[in-house]
Amino acid sequence: MLLISSETKNAVRDLLMELIRIPSVRGHEGPAARYLCDRLLPLTDRCELIAIDDAIMQDPDYAFPIPGHSYRDTPNLECVVGGNGRGRSVVFNTHLDVVPPSEGQAHAFDPIEESGTIWGRGACDAKGQVATLYALILLLRERRVRPPGDLTFHFVVEEENGGNGTLAMIRRGVRADAAVVLEPSEMCIIPAVRGAVWFDLKVFGRAAHSGNVAGRISALDK
């Protein structure tokens, strides 16, 4: 059984609550990435913000382009804990962006701790996973453990609308022997997913007056 000190638990909790306070919806992930970079820089062998070129929006696998969108202040974050050269490399991936609050959720970015559970926008998807990786990095440093292979940590933008942040890292040529993607899964290991295909569908009908529908063609029926 792995025992975690109260100091480490408190550090992880504080990081999670601070991340929840940062409203990192699409296009506004920069402050969260910079905050996390500052926290991880002294704990890793390399930690840097990776700028995303706006040219990524021309990639055939890019999802949901928005006219006028820019990545000027939405970098990915990459951190590395170097291995001892005796094992395989692993990339850990999770995301910093969150779904915008629903109507009426006035305090979505105000974290609440209740009976050992932290509530707030992104606590489950996926800032809790960010905190989990932070805990892993803290424990490696505390116990002076050098992993067999390099551990690379990607904290990406724009997962919620198709995975554009991860796409940008892949296009940089990032490679490893294995990848672990952290998402809410009820503690189940999911070795594969069905994926997704985005497409636009146009169906044409023929309009008609409600008093004379004999010649109309319903696009919905087609």
Could you tell me what each predicted segment is?
Residues 210-222:
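Acidic-enriched catalytic cores of C-N bond-cleaving enzymes acting on peptides and small amides
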Residues 126-198:
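Acidic/histidine-rich catalytic neighborhood of metal-dependent amide-processing enzymes
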Residues 112, 197-202:
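Oligomerization/assembly interface segments of phage tail-like spikes and tubes
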Residues 1-118:
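Acidic/His- and Gly-rich active-site-bordering loop/insert found
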Residues 117-131, 209:
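Glycine/serine-rich anion-binding loops at beta->alpha junctions
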